[in-house]
Amino acid sequence: MNEQYSAMRGNVSMLGKLLGDTIKDALGEEILDRVETIRRLSKSSRAGNEASRQALLNTLQNLSNDELLPVARAFSQFLNLANVAEQYHRISPHGEAASNPDALYHLFTRLKNKNLDEAQIRQAVDNLSIELVLTAHPTEIARRTLIHKLVEVNTCLSQLDHDDLADYERHQIMRRLRQLVAQSWHTDEIRKNRPTPIDEAKWGYAVVENSLWEGVPAFLREFNEQLEKSLGYQLPVEAVPVRFTAWMGGDRDGNPNVTAEVTRRALLLSRWKAAELFLRDVQVLVSELSMTVCTPELRALAGEHTQEPYREVLKRLRQQLNNTLTYLDARLRGERLPRPADLLVSNDQLWQPLHTCYRSLKACGMGIIANGQLLDTLRRVHCFGVPLVRIDIRQESTRHTEALAELTRYLGLGDYETWSEEDKQTFLLRELNSKRPLVPRHWTPSPETKEVFDTCQVIAEAPAGAIAAYVISMARTPSDVLAVHLLLKEAGCPYNLPVVPLFETLDDLNNAEAVMTQLLSIDWYRGFIQGKQMVMIGYSDSAKDAGVMAASWAQYRAQEALVRVCDNAGIALTLFHGRGGSIGRGGAPAHDALLSQPPGSLKSGLRVTEQGEMIRFKLGLPEIAVSSLTLYTSAILEANLLPPPAPKQEWRDVMDELSQTSCALYRRYIRKNPDFVPYFRSATPELELGKLPLGSRPAKRRPSGGVESLRAIPWIFAWTQNRLMLPAWLGAGTALEEAMTEGHRGTLENMYRSWPFFTTRIDMLEMVFAKSDLWLAEYYDQRLVDPALWPLGTELRQQVQRDIQAVLTIADTDHLMADLPWAAESIALRNVYTDPLNVLQAELLYRSRHQEQPDANVEQALMVTIAGVAAGMRNTG
């Protein structure tokens, strides 16, 4: 174990020393000594030395206002560097990658040992569909400019990881590392302004350009090699099991800053970036494909008189890409150029000339050339294509209801909003079947309603394939889905866009089966969807509504029911998982999360959100992206070919009890305890989080209101900061404890050993408890909370201790994370640096709340501690 982590610890130590040298150069020996003293005290405190803990508290409480910011920045920046070292460890030949066998090779070996029919495996590979939806949730706290520097630090670590480096080469790399660490130190880590939705969209496109553009073809090459080695089967050229969609620029749910015009601009920007990236690819191909021998098919395309037919075809495509770039550039500047005759609007325009070159090279005995850069480009065409990433539109159901109500009132038909569900459906289906338009040409709607109609107009004008789906948040009835279909029809949408209901509260999840059964019984609807249905399961809001245990069971049961309903109706169901990065929002290691899904729920593929900082941790580097995509692929193939058994009725009964008990306790605190909201507001930096310019979306659905109006992300962000992690465990451990008291211990232990769903739930609770810290949570209370509310904090911390014991009993282990030593090592490594930031944050919150005049140093240092704790916890919300 120690050997495996020695390389990572060595990198962490080296980066820490470089940061120390930078601080000394910038601020002098005295500040560096202060930082080192705090680090040593923190390390000793973590080892259980009570005197060191008290000294740590005294030292941080007595920092002058001028010392606050440098100390906060030192520990925050160290955690960023430690995260880079840990991320590199995942892909290093001397790290985790070396000790873990290839996930796909391991899976194919197991499948063979299970005597699975090769045709069955091949069919599962052919049907493989992974769609990752990049979202702009405001959990990526690091600035893009710092992320670029950290990516280059990773590159330097990779370069140093070679035994054959000459001394001067090693010296040059170390010099570059010093420069990067110094650049980071002298860069403000906190944004001054909130990013706009277009800034967020550009960040998403940068992930594609800097990582996925290389990462996806590299993953497909590795996947193909494993298929050849294990099955003697090659991945077809046109098979691309991975696709990417974005919510940046399309998700307007609760975000008034995402307008129809913003979506139109995001669509243009993504097409512009795609054209630019494909132009680079084609330029390389023009220089590489100088061959003269070709098929008659390519000769006919290139013309009879050219000596270099491949180059001739590719030069035309290059010109087409240049023309497309010029046109899109003008559109983005607000100019109206005539549309070029050869404007690229469909993937087929890219695919055909490239694939003709590919077929010619293969037919003429040049397969080795065809399967190089050209194959990578062809796979990019299928994965990214002309849109680069497709965009989802998301809007709340009530916005559509209000828009239609305004229209029906204008037309003298009554108030749609007040109609019964039956009357709404009758009206919607009549209009969907009508050949005449419903919206009068000269009607002037309110700005809110105009925005809904304008969005549908943007969808109608977008090239087919640029928009992936229209997601309806807070969908509760069949009319919520039919209403969007009518709005799109009225906009003249020329293609059948998937309209996706999102079920996200406990009641909505429990009602999902009834809603979809009713929808699929409607003849018009069945005819329109042509045998395919997508449904989104919301993890964040259901967990905030009912607690993680009740929410996870409701999500599982809803998925089972939806699979059953669609199977009975002969409909192919794709479940869209709206998971967050944190446990309280459905986050879990991808492999475990997928294997814990109900049997049959992944047979039409996987669609899942990748949120905020998790995009950087899982997809931010080409090698990391390859690793993440490999894990997704192996997990989906395993879930479909070796599905877990359906849970026994006895297990279901126990889960029903756990769900009811945990939900009741969770809601008793959150909704019924009058002390809870004041305690939450004072014990966490919830109010101060609103000052952080994290994302373009407001933190609350309504400016006034309590916990219920808070979005799931800031709700979890706040509890993560004070280390109580409450949303990720409240209610769950108590329910387990009560179930054991009632004689279910043996059943729970059996469930943990034999049911992946339950195993993942318990493992995730272990992870949360390992990241939580009760002495720090208590310190926040003592420093910030009215003593009259202290009993509530004490009660919650005692609850955590009992919950930990319940989890350890069921897992039959003496300490947390016994089966996940890598994660335990990672948490332990960062705690030494996160603890001082937590103590400092509590001190800064105290000063900030008690000062008569705002102090810029205090405010800035507080923001830095929030960013630093987020880095230390490896997730925000």
Swiss-Prot record:
Pfam families hit by this protein: PEPcase
Biological processes per GO annotation: carbon fixation; oxaloacetate metabolic process; tricarboxylic acid cycle
Signal peptide: none
Catalytic activity from the UniProt record: oxaloacetate + phosphate = phosphoenolpyruvate + hydrogencarbonate
Keyword vocabulary terms for this entry: Carbon dioxide fixation, Lyase, Magnesium
Cytoplasm among keywords: no
CC per GO annotation: cytosol
Active site: H137, K544
E.C. designation(s): 4.1.1.31
Cofactor: Mg(2+)
InterPro entries: PEP_COase, PEP_COase_bac/pln-type, PEP_COase_Lys_AS, PEPCASE_His_AS, Pyrv/PenolPyrv_kinase-like_dom
Keyword Magnesium tagged: yes
A molecular-function term among this protein's GO annotations: phosphoenolpyruvate carboxylase activity
NCBIfam families: PRK00009.1
Function as written in the Swiss-Prot or TrEMBL entry: Forms oxaloacetate, a four-carbon dicarboxylic acid source for the tricarboxylic acid cycle.
Family recorded in the similarity comment: Belongs to the PEPCase type 1 family.
HAMAP family: PEPcase_type1 (MF_00595)
Protein name per the record: Phosphoenolpyruvate carboxylase
Source taxonomy: Bacteria, Pseudomonadati, Pseudomonadota, Gammaproteobacteria, Enterobacterales
Gene: ppc
